[in-house]
Every structure is written in C-alpha cells, then in structure tokens.
Amino acid sequence: MARYIGPSCKLARREGADLSLKSPSRALDSKCKLEQRPGQHGAVRKSKLSDYASQLREKQKVKRIYGVLERQFRNYYKNASTKKGNTGENLLQLLETRLDNVIYRMGFAVTRPAARQLVSHRRVLVNGKLVNLPSYHVKPGDVVALSQRAQKYLCVQESLTIKDQHGSAFSWVEVDSEKFSGVFKAFPDRADLPSDINEALIVELYSK
C-alpha cells in the first residue's frame, strides 16, 4: 500500500484526534472538526464503538501518528511480543526509536513527515555516518546530527525555534541546538510517552 500524501486534516478527522501531522505553531484548522468523520457532510462520530472497532481504530491512529504502514507495524508488534516486559510498551518503544521519530523528538523537524524527508534525502548522520532509512532504530548512546547542508535549512531553524518556544524537551534525548546534534540517552518510559495512546487495545487486536 502506498504512503498517504493527502490532507492531514482528513486523517485527523478519521481518527477523531490530533495526530501531530501539523506544526505546533499551527493549530488544527477550524474546518477540521474532529468530532465529524471526513467528507463535506461527514456524520457525527458515534459515542460508542464495538470492542473490535475500538481496537482497530487505535491501531490505525498509532500507525498514522508514526507514519508506519501495515506490514511494518505488524512486524513491530511481532518483535515487541518476543521481548521481555509489556508488549504494548515494547511496541511504543520500537516506534519511538525510529530515526525519523528521534529527529522529530529532538526538534529538528516540526512533524514526523518532515523528519522523514530529512532522513530520506540523506541529511542525517548517526555516529558520524550517513543514514537514509527512516526506520533505522537508534540505540541509547547514539549521536544523531544534521548534515552541514541541512543545518542551513530555514525549516530546521524554525523548528528549533518552535521547540524552544513550546518547551518541548524530552528526557530521553539531549539536544545541542547550536551544533544541530543530539544524543539518544535511553529508551523512554511509558510515563514519558503520549497518554492518549491505549496500546492495550492494539495488543488485544493482534492477540486474537
């Protein structure tokens, strides 16, 4: 299946949630009515879903937040289920260690799609080596940096400014904005991750 490149508002309305697909400096457009489904005459969202529908919607929401396709997501789940500890938390940790997500968390890009572009266009180095795979998994202690060319991008500089204005610092990454680099210090704890994600529903869905 091809990656979705349409309006981000449509996805947000489909899931009834802000998927962080727009810059924090731009609130969701007033036309983006999250309580209604996509379409000019989108029906108002039902207050109660079946268990299966709730599980499916949660999976779709998380896939869209992290920009992962179905096959990738299923592989992440299989990997998470073989690790020690809570499968749902393991799944979120795997998603958080994707290089595109780390670039986003460090504040070098305002959205994950923008971070994915930086990686795909060969503008990111890990431990001094060029990496162009958005799905590359960063490990604790890895140093992530932007190329000299990327450091001059206005979008990168604006993103760092937005990060400072919103105070969006994360405890598991340490960023040196002046050097356009950061260290992935540790795997994030569940308490550090978004509370609006219910990973237990995803585990229930795949456990059937």
Swiss-Prot record:
One of its GO terms (biological process) is ribosomal small subunit biogenesis. GO terms for molecular function: rRNA binding; structural constituent of ribosome. Keywords: Ribonucleoprotein, Ribosomal protein, RNA-binding, rRNA-binding. Residues 97-158 form the S4 RNA-binding domain. SMART domains: Ribosomal_S4, S4. The keyword Transit peptide does not apply. Belongs to the universal ribosomal protein uS4 family. One of the primary rRNA binding proteins, it binds directly to 16S rRNA where it nucleates assembly of the body of the 30S subunit. This is Small ribosomal subunit protein uS4. It comes from Xylella fastidiosa (strain 9a5c). The gene is rpsD.
